[in-house]
Amino acid sequence: PGANHQYFKSFESFFPNEDIEFYYYDQLGSTLSDNPQIDDLWTIEHYVEEVEQVRKALGLTKDNFILLGHSWGGILGIEYALKYQDNLKSLIVSNMVPSVPDYNDYANNVLALQLDPEILKEIRSYEAIKDYTNETYLGLIHEHYYPEHVMRIPANEWPEDVVNSFAEINFPIYLKMQGPSEFGIVGDASLKNWDVTERLNEIKVPFLSIGAEYDTMDPVQMEWMANEVQNGSYLHCPNGSHMAMWDDQQNYFKGLI
């Protein structure tokens, strides 16, 4: 939540070569869109209606409207399909699972335990007192967690588009919806209890779930999701993480296109 379109710029190296027409847009509150200071707007329901407004403005229909959402955008894509799938040709959910509680469990009981025990102990000490903005805490996350599970590229080699996109995140929106921790969604974050596992079978449009071996999300659950919808398939990126469109481009775009 709160991120802009810039980290999708990797698509420009692949889609035009296949004559695929595609559109980015910045959600309300992020870089190129207005940023009204109205907390009540930052809800799934609002953003679903925003997608529908964009679709109408572009004149897209069920004959040509393929929606791709990554991470939080995957949540949004699923919710859009549950309300407006008659307007969709197909849905692509990239690097997102259908349950935030399950994501929290995976982050804390699988990925966190892969860290060096002393590093994890120090990270947990800051989380215990909710000191999520501490420079040492952030440094530990960026040094030990991000390079394994967010983007498997050395930090000093991160693409400029990704660096700029992360730098321009609207943090009030991010904190309201996602929360301050990188190990799941915690506190009063509005997405904390989001779970549509029981509704996946309502989705009838062609559905592609994209997951990655080293993702912050459980690739097993992302594959499971593809089997729960009526017409789903799964694309696995064996070398990728949460930003597989950057760190496993060969598999990501070969499977997507």
Regions found by a protein language model. Give the residues of each.
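Conserved HGGG/HGGXW glycine-rich cap/lid loop of the alpha/beta-hydrolase fold
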Residues: 1-40, 54-55
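Conserved acidic catalytic loop of the alpha/beta-hydrolase fold
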Residues: 45-64
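Conserved hydrolase catalytic core segment
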Residues: 61-107
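Flexible "cap/lid" loop of the alpha/beta hydrolase fold
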Residues: 91-133
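Alpha/beta-hydrolase
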Residues: 121-198, 205
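Short beta-strand/loop motif that positions the catalytic acidic residue
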Residues: 203, 209-211
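Conserved alpha/beta-hydrolase "acid-adjacent" motif
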Residues: 216-221
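Catalytic histidine-centered segment of alpha/beta-hydrolase-like enzymes
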Residues: 237-253
